[in-house]
């Protein structure tokens, strides 16, 4: 492998999509450090990206060795996709983007953060996790188990047996850019990546798959992006295993098995516990066992696992009303799972993978939902809402409009102007012993820059509520 800096030094690189989540910022800084000549282009305005832009300008001005970054904001230009050495695109760039087609026409490599890292990295073990639901939990669980047990890991390199592998986290994780990990990783290290369908596009373009892959679930999502084609959606997801080799491993939940080709090159492991969270838990445990982590250490890590922010996260209790943040539930299916988990069993049991033992019985959930339509069906969602929810508070969005116009929500419902009003309305409707569940069921765009901004606002509102 070449020195990573030399691979980017003096290269003319267009970064398509800076964003405000930290990933684009992270690899833009890294490439600037490597001496690349950078053009950053984003459809968002300078005002929308002000935090990221200020940080980059401060970063480059702090060293005379770093070239100034050129910004093209509020638009993309074809000229920025010509006469370049590389284009790095962010997740979610349209499949039919004329700018990507322009780069391809000019034989300019189009890369993505994680797949580009793999091309440049030394020999490291890649553990990739994908799935419409469950991938975030499995990714973090695997990382926590391995990070807490690095001393038990063995280096596969025959020349570095005495060096214990280090464990890193990357992929679709808030605030983490994978490419800059090139500064830290060594031969034999382990990288655990959460991989959404967009990042797996990059794997497909590069014809690579992780050494250990986990595929948790597959159901409709991002149909606005894939233009209602489940086939195209699956084609991207399938890159998690498509290019695996004979000694690689694919771990799946049972309902994914029907999607896996019979001529699979790698070894297939199907987990078989009882419920959704247990299956996700079993996937993480299977990875840990493959890497020879002792069972007692796995159990200890699971016991200490506190769950994930924005995923059925218990926040606080106000006047006897428990409040949960399920902000990352951006599909009807995901919100249905949250409603059922809180209605059928205690969430703590679900997160620990413990079989349900006690149900709440009557309807006690006041649901806050709403947002932008992702072109997904709502029939089953409405049935679950009517069965388990006491009331529904809806925030604005095209998906909300679709839900309201259906006229099928039979429980008490209220349409409000914003999230702040939604929380006030929910607290007004909830009684001692009830649950307020913030689980949008729809995307965040239109009202927020991204789902994290929406989740942060909800947490801030709840923090200030009494």
Q: Predicted regions: what is each one?
A:
Residues 33, 78-82, 91-248, 258-267, ...:
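Phosphate-binding loop of NTP-binding sites
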Residues 60-66, 158-162, 348-362:
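Short Gly/Ser/Thr- and charged-rich N-terminal loops/segments
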Residues 31, 87, 110, 129, ...:
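Residue-level signal for inorganic ion chemistry
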Residues 2-12, 27-34, 274-390:
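Nucleotide phosphate-binding/pyrophosphate-handling subdomain across enzymes
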């Amino acid at each position: 492998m070449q020195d990573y800096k030399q691979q980017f030094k003096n290269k003319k690189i267009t970064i398509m999509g800076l964003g405000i989540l930290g990933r684009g910022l992270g690899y833009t800084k890294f490439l600037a450090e490597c001496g690349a000549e950078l053009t950053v282009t984003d459809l968002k305005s300078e005002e929308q990206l002000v935090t990221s832009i200020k940080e980059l300008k401060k970063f480059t001005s702090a060293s005379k060795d770093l070239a100034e970054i050129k910004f093209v904001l509020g638009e993309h230009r074809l000229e920025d996709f010509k006469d370049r050495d590389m284009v790095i695109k962010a997740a979610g760039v349209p499949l039919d983007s004329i700018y990507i087609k322009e780069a391809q026409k000019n034989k300019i490599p189009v890369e993505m953060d994680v797949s580009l890292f793999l091309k440049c990295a030394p020999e490291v073990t890649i553990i990739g996790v994908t799935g419409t639901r469950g991938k975030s939990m499995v990714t973090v669980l695997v990382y926590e188990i391995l990070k807490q047990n690095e001393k038990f890991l063995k280096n596969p390199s025959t020349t570095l047996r005495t060096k214990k592998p280090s464990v890193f986290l990357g992929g679709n994780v808030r605030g983490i850019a994978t490419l800059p990990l090139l500064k830290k990783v060594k031969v034999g290290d382990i990288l655990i990546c959460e991989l959404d369908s967009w990042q797996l596009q990059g794997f497909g373009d590069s014809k690579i798959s992780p050494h250990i892959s986990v595929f948790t679930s597959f159901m409709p999502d991002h149909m606005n992006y894939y233009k209602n084609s489940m086939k195209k959606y699956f084609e991207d997801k399938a890159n998690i295993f498509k290019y695996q080799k004979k000694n690689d491993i694919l771990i799946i939940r049972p309902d994914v098995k029907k999607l896996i080709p019979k001529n699979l090159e790698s070894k297939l492991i199907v987990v078989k516990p009882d419920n959704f969270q247990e299956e996700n838990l079993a996937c993480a445990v299977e990875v840990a066992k493959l890497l020879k982590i002792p069972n007692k250490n796995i159990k200890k890590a699971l016991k200490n696992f506190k769950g994930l922010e924005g995923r059925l996260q218990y926040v606080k209790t106000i006047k006897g009303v428990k409040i949960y943040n399920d902000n990352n539930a951006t599909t009807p299916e995901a919100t249905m799972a949250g409603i059922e988990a809180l209605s059928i069993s205690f969430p703590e049991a679900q997160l620990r993978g413990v079989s349900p033992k006690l149900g709440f019985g009557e309807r006690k959930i006041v649901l806050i939902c709403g947002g932008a339509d992702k072109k997904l069906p709502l029939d089953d969602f409405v049935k679950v809402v009517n069965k388990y929810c006491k009331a529904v508070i809806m925030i604005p969005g095209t998906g909300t409009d679709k839900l309201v116009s259906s006229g099928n929500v039979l429980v008490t419902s209220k349409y409000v102007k914003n999230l702040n009003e939604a929380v006030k309305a929910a607290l007004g409707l909830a009684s001692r012993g009830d649950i307020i569940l913030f689980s949008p069921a729809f995307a965040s765009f239109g009202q927020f820059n991204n789902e994290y901004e929406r989740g942060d606002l909800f947490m801030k509102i709840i923090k200030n509520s009494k």
